[in-house]
């Protein structure tokens, strides 16, 4: 087995690490100051992100996530270590490279399933970061992890579809640059469960679309990311040409969209873990208690050793998954995709918890990134399918081998 990266990956990784050291990490306190400025428009992209985007384009670090003609043409295995690096500063690096969710998943969806007209109208400006987008699937009144529960209706009426329903935690939708909502709803409630849903493209300014409020995540409004909106759709009419794929294909398209998204989340989460471990090591070498450095305490050494082992385990599993996605496709890598989605966020949560503990009161303060990183990572155990759904599916697949 060859565990080395190819030449292109090594070159991009070196370039990206230099970009992080020279531009991203120094910009973190700038971002904090801009977000704290009461005069700044709350939901707009902070100016520092716009500045970083200019530099990222100059460096050729743009749309790295997207394979094929529309992006950098990287495989999943080539992109994985780059996504990990961006995870070390998840609030700055991914948007700086135009590699932040939910736009990444929406661009992948449009590139794979969109018509030529849909790609021209929506994909091209997204690739250029002239607009933003959101993915509207989660609903407040039902357990949205079961697609059959989705209550939003998408009804054909002549040459149009009419959308009625309510969605929430629609990431990015508070940003005024968010122009597109990809909405999941039911077109045929009588069909078999995974053929009931369809997806339509809804302009955010369409009549009947109402942003009710911004939601918080553990008290964070994630304004720099465009927040998380609760949105009502009341008699929203869109042309029939705004349907993505065919009627009844919504669930299959969602799964195709979420597969790459899950590996992107997991690689960035490993970057979060590396950042947390680095902060832990620096902290315990610098702080003294009971007559010596915290680093001399056996329990602290146990945290550090366990963190390193767990990071290496995660990375190997995620890289194997990326390789399988490239060689046998997302469907063939389904078990591994679910495995990394189960293992990575909870393991990174453990590493972050130890980092917080090592920092004491500072670990829960705004003076380190740890509290925000913990909140960000904890959501991944729910986003793109909760742990329990993935475990249930994976266990059933495992049991089928013995029946």
Placement of each model-derived feature along the sequence:
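Alpha-helical interface subdomain recognition
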Residues: 1-91, 99-101, 113-118, 125-130, ...
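Cytochrome P450 core scaffold surrounding the K-helix E-X-X-R motif
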Residues: 73, 211, 242-247
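Flexible, glycine-rich active-site loops centered on histidine and acidic residues
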Residues: 106-113, 135-136, 190
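A short, Trp-centered hydrophobic/proline-enriched beta-strand micro-motif
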Residues: 129-138, 183
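Short Gly/Pro-enriched turn/cap motifs at secondary-structure boundaries
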Residues: 141-145, 172-176, 189-191, 217-227
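Flexible, small-/acidic-enriched active-site or ligand-binding loops
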Residues: 149, 205-237
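Short, surface-exposed charged micro-motifs
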Residues: 151-153
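A short core secondary-structure module
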Residues: 159-160, 164-212
